[in-house]
């Protein structure tokens, strides 16, 4: 090929495309949407809840009498104080109408909120219902490392449809 053939080819090409308009871009470029801060926080909460709470773990809990549990190394006097209602719960979680998966997330969020707000005691109302949450909530609480103890709540805080939970808030001075 020489330069004359090249110029002639370009001239023919220019003559052919004369008057043609370029096509406007109508294709969509799909990009994965960026996750919002709320979605990231929700996913993180689910991950924490799933890592702490297992549905297959069966701890040794009392069959008769009030529902109660005390972590190793915690003074039994703390359980007695919970039973008598000496601790006033700062936070209250009502699980009425929740599914198990939702209840797990809410329970994990409650424990995180207690630690963040330096609340040593909280109340979890699981209700009566079909008894599923009433059975599962104590089993989940036993598995969480921040839970020191729990006891069936006094009548004023829900009776046998609720639990008072004692949370380990770290080295901060204890409040009642």
UniProtKB/Swiss-Prot annotation:
GO molecular function terms noted in the UniProt entry: RNA endonuclease activity; rRNA binding
Keyword set includes rRNA-binding: yes
Name of one Pfam family that matches: Smr
Domain of life, source organism: Bacteria
EC number: 3.1.-.-
Domain Smr, first and last residues per copy: 93-168
The protein, known as: Ribosome rescue factor SmrB
Record keyword rRNA processing present: no
Keywords: Endonuclease, Hydrolase, Nuclease, RNA-binding, rRNA-binding
Top enzyme category: hydrolase
GO biological process: rescue of stalled ribosome
Subunit structure: Associates with collided ribosomes, but not with correctly translating polysomes.
Recorded family membership: Belongs to the SmrB family.
Function: Acts as a ribosome collision sensor. Detects stalled/collided disomes (pairs of ribosomes where the leading ribosome is stalled and a second ribosome has collided with it) and endonucleolytically cleaves mRNA at the 5' boundary of the stalled ribosome. Stalled/collided disomes form a new interface (primarily via the 30S subunits) that binds SmrB. Cleaved mRNA becomes available for tmRNA ligation, leading to ribosomal subunit dissociation and rescue of stalled ribosomes.
Annotated TM spans: none
């Amino acid at each position: 090929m020489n330069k004359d053939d090249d110029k002639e080819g370009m001239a023919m090409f220019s003559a052919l495309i004369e008057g043609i308009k370029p096509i406007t871009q109508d294709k969509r470029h799909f990009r994965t949407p960026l996750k919002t801060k709320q979605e990231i926080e929700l996913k993180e909460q689910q991950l924490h809840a799933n890592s702490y709470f297992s549905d297959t773990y069966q701890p040794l809990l009392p069959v008769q009498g009030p529902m109660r549990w005390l972590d190793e190394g915690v003074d039994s006097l703390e359980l007695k104080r919970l039973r008598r209602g000496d601790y006033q719960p700062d936070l209250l979680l009502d699980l009425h109408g929740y599914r198990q998966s939702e209840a797990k997330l809410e329970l994990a969020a409650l424990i995180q909120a207690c630690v963040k707000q330096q609340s040593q005691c909280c109340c979890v109302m699981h209700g009566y219902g079909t008894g599923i949450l009433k059975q599962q909530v104590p089993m989940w609480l036993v598995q969480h490392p921040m839970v020191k103890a729990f006891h069936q709540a006094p009548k004023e805080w829900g009776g046998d449809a609720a639990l008072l939970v004692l949370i380990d808030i770290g080295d901060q001075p204890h409040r009642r």
